[in-house]
């Protein structure tokens, strides 16, 4: 178990909330916002990488950071009469949503079941691909079918 962090949670949160829009200059932006040294900001970034919340791409001069997926799930399902969207939600997606606030879970459930119901009832497709991705700041769900697209 890693040692207890003495890092300022406000700095960590700032980095995580802003890295998507500032992948190449998150260090400079954090220095400007908090008045920290480059070394100190680098420690924050390295800790977030070690914790699996950020990932780095490129070498030192061209290094870019991005949020790392905490969860990434994809699966295919057969669209058939009698398929219940709430069962797919309950059995396949909901178990992946650990530590997500209940109000967010409720919104995601509504969106997911409506999208899947639409694919079942209206796409005329035989199957669909479901993906669920979650990082520190966002949740992305996609249902892709090969239907008629109206």
Feature names for model-found ranges:
Residues 45-46:
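Short, hydrophobic-biased segments on the C-terminal half of alpha helices
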Residues 55, 61-74, 120-150:
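Conserved beta-strand-loop-beta-strand hairpin that lines the nucleotide-binding pocket
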Residues 28, 32-33, 92-113:
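Conserved short strand/loop->alpha-helix "switch" segment adjacent to the catalytic nucleotide/phosphoryl-transfer site
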Residues 75-102:
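Helix-loop-beta hinge of the Bergerat
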Residues 8-28, 32-33:
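Short amphipathic alpha-helical interface segments
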Residues 103-131:
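Conserved ATP-binding N-box helix of the HATPase_c
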Residues 39:
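Key DNA-contact positions within bacterial/archaeal DNA-binding proteins
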């Amino acid at each position: 178990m890693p040692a207890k962090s003495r890092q300022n949670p406000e700095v960590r949160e700032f980095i995580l909330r802003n890295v998507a829009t500032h992948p190449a200059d998150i260090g400079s932006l954090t220095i400007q916002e908090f008045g920290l040294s480059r070394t100190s900001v680098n420690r924050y970034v390295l800790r977030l990488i070690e914790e699996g919340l950020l990932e780095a791409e490129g070498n030192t001069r061209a290094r870019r950071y991005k949020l790392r997926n905490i969860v990434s799930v994809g699966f295919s399902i057969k669209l058939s009469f009698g398929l219940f969207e709430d069962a797919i939600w309950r059995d396949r997606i909901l178990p992946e949503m650990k530590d997500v606030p209940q109000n967010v879970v409720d919104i995601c459930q509504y969106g997911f079941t409506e999208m899947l119901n639409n694919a079942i009832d209206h796409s005329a497709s035989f199957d669909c691909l479901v993906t669920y991705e979650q990082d520190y700041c966002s949740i992305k769900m996609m249902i892709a079918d090969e239907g008629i697209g109206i």
